[in-house]
Curated annotation (Swiss-Prot):
Residues 795-830 form a coiled coil. Inhibited by low micromolar concentrations of Gd(3+) and high micromolar concentrations of verapamil. Insensitive to tetrodotoxin (TTX) and potentiated by low external Ca(2+) concentration. One of its GO terms (biological process) is regulation of resting membrane potential. Widely expressed in the brain and spinal cord neurons. Expressed also in pancreatic islet cells. One of its GO terms (molecular function) is sodium channel activity. This is Sodium leak channel NALCN. The gene is Nalcn. Disulfide bonds join C207-C239, C229-C245, C1046-C1057, C1405-C1417. It comes from the Eukaryota. Residues 1633-1648 have a biased composition (Low complexity).
């Protein structure tokens, strides 16, 4: 028993358990606790417990008294069950003792706490029933934890087949990421909170009537509507006559009555900033600020707040969730299941003709039971004709249902034509289902999920046609038939399947969202059900609607404000935190999960990505081969090539028909040959450039001499061509690498990643080179054969991949060549080809002049002639901007901008046709555009030329804008009636800003990114329209005519709705004043009207679709919900909630997901595998990485060194960061001159400023002024500190409002330095900054589009009368106000109400037949198209592009320790080592220092010279080869390390992979050559050493004998002659040595290893001999013998040594050495040219 228990514990250890429901004991007495049915019963009881607590509210018991006893009974039963379970588990596990005791298990503790809460709830209910405790008392809050028992119901699904440590790491890492982004959000909330406090302060000044007295402020004292004002006369809004501007707080109103939103102090300010960042109600705050303070301050604050907080910072949450989900997806692939396995392996597949006539592979079950129908019926049932007939009938049914409309109150509703049509269609589809069941058999029919759905519709619609059920919830079944139409389009069907996947992910997420809503609703219900005057949480349905409203963000501020006012001032902060946390989780994390799931479903599999990469490359090659259709038209005409014509020729001679292009080749031949020679012979070109006036004969003679001298062999020429091709590839690769790079990481491993990748490459190349000669030997074992076979397979796969890549490259080159050949053939055979307007000649001087003017552009970039890299100049960014477009385009951009500025001054009251000053810009624009278009047409042609003006949509738009401007300028209509052609022309004229899209290349790229994903966006639109059509048809059938009601709430029947009544006026939404006894709200008398709601109705499908489209944008759905519940019934509220949930959670997130996927596809990252995407992120990180701007520590241990240690200590840095935060807290209240609190706060700020001066002084002393100035962060600190010192001086000198404002600005600037001191904040701020930089052109595109709509809005709605939302602040009277309104609409703030205000028609307005500026009516069709198109383009597409950019950039900084290629720690280590080598902090080091840098690296970048000596040589030689022995930068070395640290086969794309492999192969060959040379040199040195040693032994013996003899013989005459000859020889040897050494230095390897350097050092000082010195003398023997005899007789040290060596025969080693030397000499003469050229050229 014990062994079995241990084994079960061990097996369960690596798997994450799902709680204490597992069987942990085999005790027979408590065996029931381990039964599966007990587990299921307890899970059901958990759901029952949640239902019970949802019913347990005072209001519910008041409406349904028996529920009090029902809940008491249920809770009692649940209490007994869970208590018994708890006792049994305590008995099994033990309470405290043991490893698995009850207290030590977290799930058991949770279950025990739930049992305790159940007991508390039960005891409390007993007291409530006995009337001991009041039901409305706060004691009911003890039930708040009870809904958490819902976790027990779903705990079983938390069981993962993964190691617990891995799941813990994933959750920990995800939590860290979410926590980091939350800190980032808090930083911006605090920043804008401080800014709000100092810029605005309180909004307590209102316009009140003149006789208002303190303590007597009522609703009738305020202006209607309530208006804020400014006490200063120069700024803000001034009250009208009869009113005065007063502070309501001074008049006696409390904080609760004034409302909680504002910028009074830092807490309220952060609360208000968060409300505004949710884009709900922010615009009304801005209007209040505009009325109370200077206008520019409000616009700056709120627009930047929306841009940074709402659009950038909050979208980082989406990026975090997407990245985290992508990582979890890889780990949980087993749990979700694979998306590709749609059919089981047991089923077979066959081709089937689909409805569109195409073929599809469909699964066919061989064993499917067939029905009893005849074969002809079965064949008919499977035919495409039958399929299309049924779908066409579904289409007709949908059209008929959509045609239904409200026909009036007196019309008979039961048996109209729509009902009869529905009966007919129901019978038809019933017959279809019966036929399929007859043909397939019931089992075969029901096995298909599609047939199950059809059967459900058949049953539901059959019940629906029953008269009593016709207008009921069964209508859903009828309208759901439209879903069957998805089968018509295979693309739509595939898209739907791709998005929703197997349904498990999205379904589980929907269940999770619903469960979260239920739990949070139950918690809020028990928290607020006892609060008086709050009806939002009295019952569970109301609580659910309120929490769902917060989830959708529509009106969530109203829910929170009502709750805050009801709970009182004391509990308001806690309640606000509760709602904000729930809103934060629901809107950011939960919605981001939906986006992540949809993006995951749109993701392709890894193998499909590589296949699609190849297919896409092939498709690109095919498309490049074809000419555009406008040029292929010339192929339809007969060929008429131009022939040679000679102007002066006698008539006796006839010119043969020779093509002019053929003769031109010979005419230009001499010039081409000369250019070719100049390319080959650099000396020739230089000499000719030096003497340009040299005669032609001398030139030819000089060239001829050069040609004769330089004789090129065939091999050298081929070698040159090969090197040139390789050089081009390497230059391209170098250029690409110099512009890219970056790094992130993994934990340190035992083995360096450089070493691992090097061994992978070596193994791969050994396979590639050795597999051709692989033969199976007889003695090999089976394992060896298997290994060899796998190696062969791997080699073949690699070889096949290589061949595919090369084939695609060749295909691309051939396509480009083919296209050029086609163009040349057309140019030669058709005289009118490439002739602008068929008039201007191809090479005409005027056309060449136009080309020069059109294509002239600024170009200040300098290119390195060796590497081809672009050298960065000092102002290269400015130069790049100037060279972005041509000079002509710059002129037109300037003219267009000036014209748009002029258009901004137009209004309905200052029109261009009546204002001569506005006409100047109009004339200038048309004149300049005429000149531009004429130049471009004469240079490039209009349409039928290769580079025509009209070759894409941009050219068409240019011509269209020009024609519209020209027609308007010529016409200039004086009277423009509304909805006329002249007004349409004025609207089209507003498209002028779109010209900038065409003129700027990056703007054209934005447009391509928008329209390239049009197909997917179109499919999403179809899905959403289908959803809207389903619900619109349902709404028409259920709510048509039912939403109309009398505007007097006291009248119920239509007959009584007549006469007049008094209606109250809404004065203010912010103030919470209570009516005093006898007081009435302001109002007036109006007639009673029986009418639909103003903004929506369901009387026909068109109006219903419009209402649902507004609801789909999550605007106005709360009003639709309230009207439906109030006028039709509470049960029908489910309708709008289901639609909003589907539209919000799935519909809108679909747009986000599709736009992000399309953006990735356009960027080229959609088809990248995981490794390739990480490699791209790595290169992008490398761009951002910079050397550390930190000077080295002073050498000695003096005062500066101690200062350096102090300033670099972490404790010092944290202290400074805390001081910065402490100084920022001083801005918690507004610094006002009149406030006595300001003086001590400013004094404390002065103290902080002196502390920061001390900090800067210490750093300057420690680092020296030059070292301090290296860091940008130090420069910023110095700037802020200097400003602080200036402020201190001004503060004590002046002490006025301006000095206080300056002091607050200095503190805010100091607050920004927090980001640099915190790693996570710095990383996330970098994400936002880079996103802003990359999205600059998208933002400019949004603004240009906004400008076009603003100009059109001024023309269409400039004089519309004020309504509910068109008012003093929001209107289209000028372009500036129109831009403000449109920016408000971008955020979705009541855009539908503004649209309805602009739709106002007579009799509610005054029309005018002659001029549009004299009427105050709107334009119904214009408003519909205007607002809907603007909202879809901007809010659904353009804003989601911002999200896509943020997601892309966040992935650069998203660090996971396991999966990244290089971590931040590795990069930090490299920066520190670089600073050690780059001691001068220049950012570059000489090439020879690279080897020292590489030897100093440790960790994952370490190169072990004992194991990876060859890798070390390759890396050093790569640096020397790419940079020609010059200086290398920080990014050069980091880029080389990045290439060496990845598996290039997996990470690099096709072109880059080829270039990189070619470079590495070349480096290997060169290093191999150098290694051979080094080895031969060492061998020769060793041979020399042996020969010298043998000669020295004999010489020493001879010398000793000669010394003894020399004592007796001293012939002076002979001694003086012989050594002189020898000395000459020695002197010759020495004179030859420098040449030899220089030659060896030239040919020595460019990198030397340690062994070679030691050998050279050991040989230093030894005699060096020439190569020919070891050859035997050729003189006759007698002479040598005579000489030797003389020498022996007379002696001499040098001579004796030479003679001995010559007389002894050479040993075998010496003869071998001479042969090696001869071979070595030949190799040097041949290979020195090749290798030397390689090194120098590249």
């Amino acid at each position: 028993m014990l062994k079995r228990k241990q084994s079960s514990r061990v097996e369960a250890q690596p798997v994450t358990d799902f709680g204490p429901d597992e069987s942990l004991s085999d005790n027979a007495d408590i065996l029931w606790i381990n039964k599966p049915w007990v587990h299921s019963l307890l899970r059901i009881c958990a759901i029952i417990s949640v239902i019970s607590v949802c019913m347990n509210t005072p209001m519910t018991f008041e409406h349904y008294p028996p529920l009090q006893y029902v809940t008491f009974t249920l809770d009692t039963l649940l209490m007994f069950l869970y208590t018994a379970e708890m006792i049994a588990k305590m008995h099994i596990r033990g309470i405290v003792k043991g490893d698995s005791s009850y207290v030590k298990d977290r799930w058991c503790v949770f279950d025990g706490f739930m049992v305790f809460c159940l007991w508390v709830s039960l005891v409390l209910q007993v007291f409530e029933i006995a009337d001991i405790v009041d039901q409305m008392s706060p004691w009911g809050m003890l039930r708040i934890p009870r809904p958490l028992i819902m976790i027990r119901a779903f705990r079983i699904y938390f069981r993962f087949e993964l190691p617990r440590t891995r799941i813990t790491n994933i959750l920990k890492r995800s939590g860290e990421q979410i926590w980091s982004v939350s800190i980032f959000l808090l930083f911006f909330l605090l920043l804008y909170g401080i800014l709000g406090v100092q810029m605005f302060g309180t909004f307590t000044y209102h316009c009140v009537v003149n006789d208002t007295k303190p303590g007597n402020v009522t609703w009738n004292s305020l202006a209607i509507p309530d208006t804020h004002c400014s006490p200063e006369l120069e700024e803000g809004y001034q009250c009208p006559p009869g009113f005065k501007c007063m502070d309501l707080e001074d008049l006696g109103l409390s904080r609760q009555e004034l409302g909680y939103s504002g910028f009074n102090e830092i807490g309220t300010s952060i609360f208000t900033v968060y409300e505004a960042s949710s884009q709900e109600g922010w615009v009304f705050l801005m209007y209040r600020a505009i009325d109370s303070f200077p206008r520019w301050r409000s616009y700056f604050y709120f627009i930047t707040l929306i841009f940074f907080l709402a659009w950038l910072v909050k979208n980082v949450f989406i990026a975090v969730i997407i990245e985290t989900f992508a990582e979890i997806r890889v780990q949980f692939q087993q749990m979700w299941g694979t998306r590709s396995s749609t059919t089981s392996t047991a089923t077979t597949q066959m081709f089937h003709e689909d409805a569109a006539g195409g073929w599809q592979l469909v699964a066919v079950d061989v064993n499917k039971p067939q029905g009893r129908a005849p074969a002809c019926l079965q064949k008919m049932m499977r035919s495409s004709v039958f399929h299309m007939f049924i779908l066409s009938m579904v289409t007709v049914d949908v059209i008929v249902a959509a045609s239904n409309y409200y026909k009036g109150e007196n019309f008979r509703r039961q048996y109209d034509e729509f009902y009869l049509a529905e009966v007919a269609f129901t019978v038809l589809f019933d017959l279809e289902a019966l036929l399929k069941i007859w043909c397939l058999g019931f089992t075969g029919y029901i096995s298909s999920s599609l047939h199950k759905f059809e059967l459900l519709l058949v049953i539901g619609t059959t019940l629906h046609v029953y008269p009593d059920l016709y207008h009921s919830q069964f209508t859903y079944f009828q309208v759901l038939r439209v879903v069957r139409l998805i089968k018509i389009s295979p693309a739509l069907e595939d898209f739907v399947y791709k998005i929703f996947g197997p349904g498990k992910k999205l379904g589980s997420l929907v269940v999770f969202t619903a469960s979260l809503l239920i739990v949070m609703s139950a918690i809020s219900l028990q928290m607020f059900c006892f609060v008086e005057e709050l009806d939002r949480f009295t019952t569970f349905p109301r609580a659910f609607m309120s929490m769902f409203q917060i989830l959708t963000q529509e009106g969530w501020v109203d829910v929170m404000d009502q709750t805050l006012n009801a709970v009182g001032h004391m509990w308001a902060p806690l309640v606000a935190i509760y709602f904000i946390l729930y809103h934060l989780f629901a809107t950011l994390i939960l919605l981001s999960l939906f986006v992540a799931v949809i993006l995951d479903n749109l993701e392709l599999d890894e193998d499909l990505k590589k296949l699609k990469q190849l297919k896409q490359s092939e498709a690109n090659a095919d498309t490049k081969e074809k000419l555009p259709l406008r040029l292929r038209i010339f192929e339809k005409f007969p060929n008429r090539p131009q022939m040679v014509k000679i102007s002066k020729l006698p008539s006796d001679f006839t010119v043969p028909k020779i093509r002019e292009s053929f003769m031109k080749q010979f005419i230009d031949r001499q010039q081409q040959d000369t250019c070719c020679l100049f390319r080959i012979l650099p000396s020739t070109s230089s000499s000719s450039c030096d003497n340009p006036k040299k005669p032609t004969a001398e030139d030819n003679k000089y060239i001829d001499q050069k040609l004769r001298k330089s004789v090129f062999s065939i091999r050298a020429r081929n070698l040159l061509e090969k090197e040139t091709a390789v050089t081009k590839i390497l230059r391209a690769c170098t250029r690409q690498r110099m512009l890219s790079g970056s790094f992130e990481g993994q934990p340190a491993k035992e083995r360096s990643i450089l070493s691992v990748q090097h061994h992978i490459r070596q193994e791969r190349r050994s396979l590639r080179h050795g597999s051709n000669s692989q033969r199976i030997s007889r003695g090999k074992s089976l394992e060896t054969l298997t290994q060899d076979h796998s190696n062969t397979v791997r080699y073949r796969n690699a070889q096949r991949e290589d061949s595919e890549i090369k084939m695609i490259q060749e295909k691309k080159e051939q396509a480009e060549m083919k296209r050029k050949v086609q163009e040349e053939e057309l140019r030669e055979n058709h005289p009118y080809f490439d002739k602008p307007l068929f008039i201007v000649g191809r090479e005409h001087r005027f056309r060449n002049f136009c080309r020069v003017v059109v294509r002239a552009r600024f170009n200040a970039s300098k290119t390195d002639p060796v590497t081809g890299a672009v050298k960065n100049t000092k102002y290269h960014q400015l130069y790049d901007l100037l060279g972005l477009v041509t000079y002509l385009d710059w002129v037109m951009i300037t003219v267009t901008i000036c014209s748009c500025i002029s258009m901004m001054f137009e209004s309905p009251f200052r029109r261009v046709m009546h204002a001569p000053t506005l006409q100047i810009a109009e004339y200038v624009f048309v004149i300049f555009m005429s000149i531009e278009l004429n130049l471009k047409i004469m240079a490039d042609g209009l349409f039928f030329t290769p580079t025509a003006v009209i070759r894409d949509f941009g050219g068409v738009m240019d011509i269209f804008i020009y024609l519209v401007s020209l027609i308007f300028l010529c016409w200039m209509p004086q009277n423009v009636p509304a909805e006329s052609g002249a007004q349409l022309l004025m609207v089209l004229r507003c498209l002028r800003p779109l010209r900038i899209f065409k003129l700027v290349p990056q703007m054209r790229k934005v447009v391509r990114e928008l329209f390239s994903g049009f197909k997917e966006i179109f499919l999403v639109s179809i899905l959403l329209l289908t959803l809207m059509l389903v619900f619109a048809s349902f709404g028409v059938q259920l709510f048509a005519g039912k939403l109309a009601k009398c505007n007097d709430p006291n009248i119920i029947r239509r007959e009584d709705c007549n006469g007049i009544f008094r209606i109250n006026v809404s004065v203010s939404k912010n103030l919470n004043l209570k009516l005093r006894p006898g007081e009435k709200k302001p109002g007036f008398w109006v007639p009673r009207v029986w009418a639909n709601p103003r903004n929506f109705n369901f009387d026909n499908v068109g109006n219903a679709m419009l209402a649902l489209f507004e609801v789909l944008s999550l605007k106005g759905w709360v009003e639709v919900r309230d009207v439906i519940i109030h006028r039709v019934g509470p049960i029908h509220g489910i309708y709008i909630h289901v639609f909003v949930f589907l539209g919000c959670m799935i519909g809108l997130t679909l747009f986000v997901g599709v736009v992000i996927a399309n953006f990735n596809e356009n960027k080229g990252t959609a088809l990248l595998t995981v490794d390739q995407r990480r490699w791209e992120d790595l290169k992008s990180r490398l761009k951002i990485a910079q050397p550390l701007h930190l000077p080295p520590r002073p050498d000695n241990d003096g005062f500066r060194a101690k200062m350096y240690d102090i300033t670099q200590h972490p404790f010092f840095k944290r202290t400074i960061a805390l001081l910065v935060l402490a100084q920022s807290v001083l801005l918690s209240v507004k610094w006002d001159v009149d406030d006595p609190v300001t003086v001590p706060l400013a004094t404390m700020s002065v103290v902080f400023t002196f502390i920061f001066v001390l900090e800067v002084t210490m750093k300057i002393i420690a680092m020296s002024p030059a070292g301090f100035w290296q860091s940008r962060r130090n420069r910023y600190d110095l700037l802020v500190t200097s400003l602080g010192v200036v402020w201190v001086v001004l503060h004590f000198a002046l002490l006025n409002a301006y000095t206080y404002m300056m002091g607050a600005c200095v503190i805010v600037f100091r607050f920004f330095s927090i980001c640099g001191k915190h790693v996570t904040l710095k990383m996330l701020l970098l994400t936002v900054v880079v996103s802003m930089y990359k999205s600059f052109f998208i933002i400019v595109g949004m603004f240009l589009l906004l400008l076009c709509y603003a100009f059109a809005g001024v023309v269409l709605f400039g004089t519309v009368k004020y309504g509910e939302n068109i008012n003093r602040h929001a209107n289209f009277s000028s372009a500036g106000k129109a831009i403000t309104v449109l920016f408000r609409i971008v955020t979705g703030e009541d855009w539908n109400k503004i649209m309805h205000d602009c739709m106002v028609q007579p009799p509610f307005c005054t029309p005018d037949e002659f001029t549009y500026w004299a009427t105050d009516c709107g334009n119904y069709a214009g408003a519909l198209m205007y607002f809907c198109s603007f909202y879809v383009i901007i809010a659904y597409i353009m804003l989601n592009l911002l999200v896509a950019i943020i997601v892309e950039n966040f992935s650069l900084f998203y660090s996971t320790e396991e999966d990244q290629l290089l971590s931040y720690n590795d990069l930090r280590h490299f920066q520190i080592i670089w600073n050690m080598v780059d001691d001068k902090r220049e950012g570059v080091i000489p090439t020879f220092r690279v080897k020292f840098l590489l030897r100093l690296l440790r960790g994952r970048l370490e190169v072990d010279l004992d194991k990876d000596k060859l890798l070390f040589k390759h890396m050093c030689y790569e640096m020397e080869r790419l940079h020609n022995g010059g200086d290398v930068t920080f990014h050069d070395v980091l880029s080389m390390l990045s290439y060496r640290s990845v598996d290039i086969r997996k990470s690099l794309q096709l072109e880059e992979l080829l270039a990189r492999e070619q470079l590495e192969y070349t480096i290997e060959e060169e290093v191999a050559k150098q290694t051979i040379r080094m080895w031969l040199k060492k061998c020769l040195k060793r041979i020399r050493a042996k020969q010298q040693q043998s000669c020295s032994i004999i010489h020493s013996l001879r010398e000793s004998q000669e010394q003894e003899r020399s004592r007796f013989l001293n012939p002076p005459s002979i001694e003086t002659t012989q050594p002189s000859e020898d000395s000459n020889a020695n002197s010759q040897d020495h004179s030859m040595q420098p040449e030899t050494s220089s030659q060896q230095q030239l040919l020595s390897p460019t990198l030397s290893d340690r062994g070679g350097s030691r050998q050279d050092a050991a040989d230093t000082g030894k005699p060096q001999r020439k190569i020919g010195q070891w050859r035997l003398p050729s003189a006759p023997k007698p002479i040598s013998h005579s000489v030797s005899s003389v020498n022996l007789r007379f002696g001499g040290r040098t001579t004796m040594k030479t003679v001995v060596c010559k007389m002894n025969p050479m040993p075998d080693t010496a003869s071998c050495g001479s042969e090696v030397k001869k071979w070595w000499t030949r190799q040097l003469t041949v290979e020195s040219d090749e290798s030397g050229d390689d090194l120098l050229d590249i």
